[in-house]
């Protein structure tokens, strides 16, 4: 005779195993350091607010596709870790945490440094199963540390997407009059005449972005530069393209 209780339990187990193998397991990793509070014009969103809105849209898409999604937020330390789940009620938890993240960031405004590489290693060591890791950051840290952290995920067979958020002014450097620049993380101030080093700044900025692009490409990491005047659908389409390739 068949032990129906054992059969039912086994059946549920195999269904669960199948779902875990076919559905994606994703983690949204958000940099909330003080440099992410920057915006050059009131018409642009601060980088963090843009990133939070992007993360909320991604979480919604993932839950709708019955993918599990988790969240890690950090500045110079881990601020929040929420394991991945795929149930509809989990979306409310994630959105609530993203709302809190913005509120805390506005209260702090300045003085929060960043340790991107360390935070990536922390998450890589916690993930036991392969999945998709989505980093949302301005990458304002030592490139060596950031890239080593990203490669840690690839070594463990995770797929990785990097949304590199930049304010348009950080790329074009439109400043012409004497300006006081403030480092939002260290709070150091520099009063200077921008035209004296604008060309050098642009060269270094171009080289910095190019390095991220090249090394990410070499390690099959999807690198997407997103300036905060870019419509969200551009970034979301890149995610959907990646999601389609994984199935």
What are these regions (language model features)?
Residues 6, 15-56, 60-247:
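Exposed, interaction-prone extracellular/peripheral surfaces
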């Amino acid at each position: 005779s068949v032990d129906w209780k054992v059969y039912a339990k086994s059946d549920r187990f195999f269904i669960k195993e199948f779902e875990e193998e076919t559905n994606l397991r994703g983690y949204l990793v958000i940099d909330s350091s003080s440099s992410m509070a920057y915006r050059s014009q009131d018409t642009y969103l601060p980088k963090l607010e843009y990133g939070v809105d992007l993360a909320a849209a991604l979480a919604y898409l993932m839950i709708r596709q019955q993918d599990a999604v988790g969240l890690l937020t950090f500045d110079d330390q881990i601020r929040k870790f929420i394991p991945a789940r795929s149930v509809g009620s989990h979306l409310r938890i994630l959105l609530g945490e993203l709302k809190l993240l913005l509120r805390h960031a506005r209260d702090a405004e300045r003085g929060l440094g960043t340790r991107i590489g360390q935070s990536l290693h922390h998450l890589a060591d916690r993930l036991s199963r392969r999945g998709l890791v989505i980093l949302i950051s301005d990458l304002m840290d030592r490139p060596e540390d950031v890239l080593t952290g990203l490669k840690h995920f690839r070594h463990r067979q995770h797929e990785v997407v990097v949304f590199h958020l930049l304010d348009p002014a950080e790329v074009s450097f439109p400043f012409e009059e004497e300006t006081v620049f403030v480092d939002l993380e260290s709070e150091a101030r520099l009063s200077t005449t921008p035209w004296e080093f604008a060309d050098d700044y642009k060269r270094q900025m171009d080289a910095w972005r190019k390095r991220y692009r090249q090394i990410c490409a070499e390690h099959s990491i999807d690198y997407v530069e997103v300036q905060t005047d870019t419509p969200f659908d551009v970034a979301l389409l890149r995610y959907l393209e990646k999601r389609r390739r994984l199935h």
